[in-house]
Amino acid sequence: MQLIMKTDSLEIPKIHFDEKGELIIVASASSSKDDFDFFQGKSVIRNKKLKKRFVNSNEWIEFPSTQEMYKILNGIGNIDNFLATFDEEPFEGMTVRLFNPKTKLWSIYWADSTSGTLDKPVVGSFENKVGHFFSKDIFEGKNVIQVFRWDARDENNPVWSQAMSDDKGKNWEWNWFMYMSKTN
């Protein structure tokens, strides 16, 4: 089930669960409210999204989009707007990211013009300019764990990617890559 892209040379950190089966997420020592500063401003994006998930598909859909991020809440949060066109219809997404100064963890929430709801957050932190953010979720009736990865090692061309696991993190299927280029 694991799909490795050429751009994906980073390992997903091993995940751990408590006695109730909940994810244990601990912030890195370097986690900071400034971790997303690289993303501030406008970007153009080349998206590569898996057409179907969990069917061993190798068929990808590619499309352009734009995104603009700005800080909120005196720097412990940020918001971005994601604009694209799917099937000749306008699509808008919005991300809210909040940094908890006590736990040093980021919570990332997503909403879009299709669902009109705020998704459960993915939670995590950055280490060495790479962030991993996890959550338990349900995808088409399956219990899954999802991970968002932010790779900011090249701050002018960051890469966001998403993977899901239906076997508690033993195997991951990458299903979306966003290759960004800063425009300001």
What does each model-identified segment do?
Residues L3-N184:
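Hydrophobic small-molecule pocket/channel-lining residues, especially in calycin-type beta-barrels
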